[in-house]
């Protein structure tokens, strides 16, 4: 690769040439060099005057702006933003990405239909299914169907709530009102669509989106309960049941338990979170939630790094950065993986190396390949930091660099072998090589999991090993070290992207997010982050309708 993908960003960030070894500090104007910090200062003064309590004051504590307060290019875009605009609190797109995951649950109709036909002796047809879907799309946002004197939600406040279905049977899908159908044939390339339909078969599955405002006010575990209540009421109404008859219990069981797929599993009590919270979302699920693979299927690097960006934001910025630690600094561990095209450059190098030497997914799935590919990519990355001092200043933390280099090594190894476990092994080897070269990786404890992780890559034992696609933020040793989990998710995607697989872990999850009615566009994760940073993203769940006009 003659042109480094990160060069333009370095030239935009710094006055000096990227190869220059000298710069200046302390004479840059402090926080005033940043438009966003200046805006914050003015806003903080207004807040303080209004409430009578001092607020934002960057002159307290360590002075800001001793170095360049650099802009960031959101990778794969031409958009440059300030770092503050990539904090999830300041970015509506990032918030909505998590909202759209948390408020989703997949519920089968197969058990319910069996109850209707076998217990109640009623017929289930495409017409009755469409009638049920009309009913549940009335009820799911928070409206009543079988009770009188019920309070209801304002439709404009919950406009993002709806229910769709999908099936692997084209004949059934064609008979249901298309407004309610996720059309697998339209949303996926032909070969992916055929694979997914074969996985689903004749089953019919509902994709439920509860209102953003509900999951924000409550929590992720509310999603399946809210969903089950409205599904149960809609079944009673659509199939004209007596609400107290015995079969009602079967419907409740089907809607709440029997065929329910959460986006995240229940966490142990010491972390005190229910289903559909970030700590329970497996890496393979997150890879399937990201939809890059159905539009960028010829570019495994783009597909894998879109998953990295998705995971870096969710796992590092929201889960570890706030749920677990309560801090604000974790943002910059995440942004290193999706800004300035640095990880992109390193990973495209690795992909080209693999293609030239082996072919994608053609290398032996063994340690010789891990040693070859991960070493080559790691040394390439470290050489870039040596050659371009501005790159070191861009990723000023050792843990940022360690995560980026190891992610490129891991993805590239997975491209070679077609296996996520050897990709993970490539990650750990990269960490060892990096520490050997630079004597350190990051802050104290950053590399805890990297020092012990290699021991359970290929051993599948209780609490000591799992296929990477099944691991998640709550996997032992992964629980608190930033700069890892999003990258692991990308490595879990990498072999499947290189092979052109239709999904990574769960075909139902992949299909559920192939939905044009979602507020967040999961086919273009980094582009959506950029829109949020520019304040151009329109989120759901806003309360302007019920607040005083200004």
Swiss-Prot record:
Where is coenzyme B annotated to bind? 225, 256-257, 270
Spans traversing the lipid bilayer: none
Q: Quick one: where is this thing mainly located?
A: cytoplasm
Q: How is the cofactor bound?
A: Binds 2 coenzyme F430 non-covalently per MCR complex. Coenzyme F430 is a yellow nickel porphinoid. Methyl-coenzyme-M reductase is activated when the enzyme-bound coenzyme F430 is reduced to the Ni(I) oxidation state.
Q: What is its EC number?
A: 2.8.4.1
Instruction: Please give the pathway this protein is involved in.
Output: One-carbon metabolism; methyl-coenzyme M reduction; methane from methyl-coenzyme M: step 1/1
Residues the record lists as binding coenzyme M: 333, 444
PTM annotation (S-methylcysteine): residues: 452
Reactions the enzyme catalyzes: coenzyme B + methyl-coenzyme M = methane + coenzyme M-coenzyme B heterodisulfide
Q: How is it modified after translation?
A: The alpha subunit contains six modified amino acids near the active site region. Is methylated on His-257, Arg-271, Gln-400 and Cys-452, probably by the action of specific S-adenosylmethionine-dependent methyltransferases. Also contains a thioglycine at position 445, forming a thiopeptide bond. Contains a didehydroaspartate residue at position 450. The methylation on C5 of Arg-271 is a post-translational methylation not essential in vivo, but which plays a role for the stability and structural integrity of MCR.
Q: Where is the signal peptide?
A: none
Its quaternary structure? MCR is a hexamer of two alpha, two beta, and two gamma chains, forming a dimer of heterotrimers.
Record's protein name: Methyl-coenzyme M reductase I subunit alpha
